[in-house]
């Protein structure tokens, strides 16, 4: 297979000149263009991204760092980012951070060293200071699901605290007073904020509950099962549950049924995210909508705009969560 060096040798020009011709640079003279095109045709040479990038200084790559691409939540984020990238003739390079400092650091540095035109970063383990350092090196780096002081105009986030507060307030309005919280065991700000929202709503309603009503688990179905089992083992008079996400809610529903109880007749359950599973489990899950697709689109558009102009085209919003009513909550007044 012919290389750009082969083309340059046959055409009698430099590799840089071949790159200029490939990128249709006005700096390429007519004679050089004819020689290079003839050599490319003779060698059946197909320009690759690396050759184009030599002159354009653009890799046509958007880097995206997520927690774990196998998680449906992050799968939705990647898909939405890819749709925007495709519209701009770009491709994605994806890294996994797993909510671990070293993995997030390695992932960000891989994307930066790969000469990505822009980056959308979902990082929870690294400090604000370290992320500000990376952002200073790359003006087209945008952060999603996090607000970093000093970089607010490059952050696309959701009000997690408000979302959990909405869920708990809804249960309180339905007459529930003994509301358990299934929190994530991951030490990230999402967990802290959602737990704070739960406590905010209880405090506003004058509802005092001991910490025994809070159980933590991995933010997956199995974690929801473990946390719900821990709550039930205490024989607390729980009538409702606020879960960290829809998968923990699904695990909780499984344990409720396994213990001879029924949802929502005995225990109401609310999730968070409005992921696909919320629409298909039984009962269909009342939840908080997390517009991750819209947020990822906004973040990618912002990152690409910064890459092309280095100026802020718009101030990204902090998205407001929305309560989605389905069938997993029952009023205590009925």
Language model features by range: what are they?
Residues 1-58, 333:
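N-terminal helix-turn-helix DNA-binding module of bacterial transcription factors
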Residues 1-3, 41-79, 87-90, 98-99, ...:
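N-terminal helix-turn-helix/winged-helix DNA-binding helices
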Residues 15-19, 54-70, 170, 178-185:
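Short beta-strand segments enriched in small/hydrophobic residues
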Residues 49, 66-76, 94-103, 146, ...:
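Hinge/beta->alpha junction and helix N-cap segments in small-molecule ligand-binding domains
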Residues 83-132:
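Central regulatory/effector-binding core of bacterial HTH transcription factors
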Residues 99, 118-166, 187, 247, ...:
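Flexible loop/hinge segments that line or gate small-molecule binding clefts
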Residues 177-178, 209-213, 262-268:
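Short acidic capping loops at alpha-helix termini that bridge into adjacent secondary structure
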Residues 229-240, 244-334:
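Flexible loop/turn connectors
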